[in-house]
């Protein structure tokens, strides 16, 4: 089973590449979706996040309030490390389960791991190929504004 890591920064084109590879028959495992899945309401990961960061990171529906959590961890390397210590092991285990599930389809199955932060998440895996999506910073900012609805000022402030 060929295992391909697809990585790159925000709005670099990862999702477009992943969609095209899926159209060609690859099984795409989406790290961002796995993060959302392991942090779903009622999950052990979400309960641990609440224990560590407080009830104010949970919204009225019992889901993670990403903005509230972000306010606590971004800009504070120690807090971000605490969050990563909770989330990364669960993401690693679930992604491994999905890789194994894809492999059961046969040895020819190509598996693509769409992961924004490969170096932080799964750098030690035996990748057959690492693909880095790249686009110039001005193009990435344009995509963020036009395709994702980000405020132009916020896009300009990003370090890309």
What are these regions (language model features)?
Residues 46, 50, 137-145, 152, ...:
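An amphipathic alpha-helix signature
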Residues 1-26, 30-33:
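Walker A (P-loop) phosphate-binding motif
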Residues 24, 53, 126-127:
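Short, structured coil segments at secondary-structure junctions
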Residues 13, 32, 83, 112, ...:
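Residue-level signal for inorganic ion chemistry
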Residues 33-110:
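ATP-dependent small-molecule kinase phosphotransfer cores
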Residues 92, 96-104, 110-146:
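ATP-dependent NMP and nucleoside kinases share a basic, alpha-helical "lid"
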Residues 12, 44, 78, 90, ...:
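Short alpha-helical
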């Amino acid at each position: 089973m060929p295992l391909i890591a697809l990585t790159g920064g925000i709005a670099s084109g990862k999702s477009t590449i992943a969609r095209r590879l899926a159209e060609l028959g690859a099984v795409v495992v989406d790290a961002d979706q796995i993060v959302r899945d392991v942090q779903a309401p009622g999950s052990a990961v979400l309960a641990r996040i609440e224990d560590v960061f407080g009830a104010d990171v949970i919204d009225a529906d019992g889901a993670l309030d990403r903005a509230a959590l972000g306010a606590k961890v971004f800009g504070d390397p120690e807090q971000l490390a605490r969050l990563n210590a909770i989330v990364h092991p669960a993401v690693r285990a679930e992604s491994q389960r999905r890789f194994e599930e894809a492999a059961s389809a046969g040895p020819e199955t190509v598996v693509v791991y769409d992961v924004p932060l490969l170096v932080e998440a799964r750098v030690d895996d035996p990748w057959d190929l690492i693909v880095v999506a790249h686009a110039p910073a001005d193009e990435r900012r344009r995509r963020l504004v036009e395709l994702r609805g980000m405020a132009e000022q916020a896009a300009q402030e990003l370090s890309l």
